[in-house]
Amino acid sequence: MNSLQVLTKKVLIENKAFSNYHEDDSFILQQLGLWWENGPIGFCKQCKMVISGSMSCSDVDSYELDRALVKAVKENQTDLIKLFVLWNADINYGIMCAKTERTKVLCIQLGANPEFLDNKKLYNMFVNLVRQQKVLLAIDIYYDNILILDSFGSHDFHALINFIYNGYILNLDEKEKMTRNTLVLKFWYKLAIEFNLIKPIRFLSKKFPHLDDWRLKTAVYLGNVDEIHHAYFQENIRLEPNHMMSLACMYPQNKLGIYYCFALGANINTALETLIRFINHEVYREITFFSNYGIWSNIHFCISLGANPDTKKIQETLLREEKNVIMKLLFKKGFLGPHSILHKKILEPSEVRKIISTYEYTETFHSFSSLRDNLR
């Protein structure tokens, strides 16, 4: 049962009783538990967002209701926990973050299932949050929550990360020995960039500025041109274009990432050389042509951008790699060539998408498809 005090707070907040507060009232509001972050607490029923002072629901620092609950649980703010549950926050998220026995008991009294403290439930919750793309809520629950991270079995934990990441993190952090904490953070950060979840990206970039270069690399690798443009031109985060291009080339069918690096000044012939070396490496690992279709698509796209397969360095590479008959045949027969739609270097993300869409519509790729079919 909720106290009269909690119910009174609920009514006052919902009716925006503190929207025009005086600075002298701030201490009293804090003592009464009516303060959130840097101002009087507010709640938007429509958006289910907890806000502070004059903050809007779309503000990067606004909290979804379940995130606000997790924060209140971590800070042992009893009345706020009850208040957020009244607004239908999921108390099961709270019990996962309770730091004291008293708060844990309160969560159970409010309806939390104690089974959510079991390893299996914690693991399943992680998977469910991936499906729902609740990046910030997941980070609030799992990041810096040593009890949860240590409760995961080492094999299961890394199997989950590797399955969804497909080795991606290690491709960008080969020399870094990451803790579970860092692995979890980068896992969710990558998810936000992959699906272009603007608010989580902005929130995380503000909270973890030491990962700015990593963020740009990730955006390039995944072909998120909106984030590349934002990091590069609005935040002045810069990396050498050819280095960025080498990352873009490694992600299958990454036309957006490759084009953007090309428009920034990366050498397209160097990109083609990188891809040929990669394909040769895969051939020696006995990975078939067909399973590497996405990388072959990148090769085709680089040539469409003007890369010259007849350069001395590329021809020398082809001569050395006797096993890669397909590539030699492809280049020797002249099946591929530059595409006129790609001769301009555009950096505005929406225009880049239009160019790539037009290219994909007009580029039939018949010769490449025919070659592939004849080799089956």
From Swiss-Prot:
Top-level taxon in the UniProt lineage: Viruses
GO biological process terms on file: taxis
Pfam families reported in the protein's UniProt record: ASFV_360
InterPro entries: ASFV_MGF360
Purpose: Plays a role in virus cell tropism, and may be required for efficient virus replication in macrophages.
Family: Belongs to the asfivirus MGF 360 family.
Protein name, UniProt field: Protein MGF 360-7L
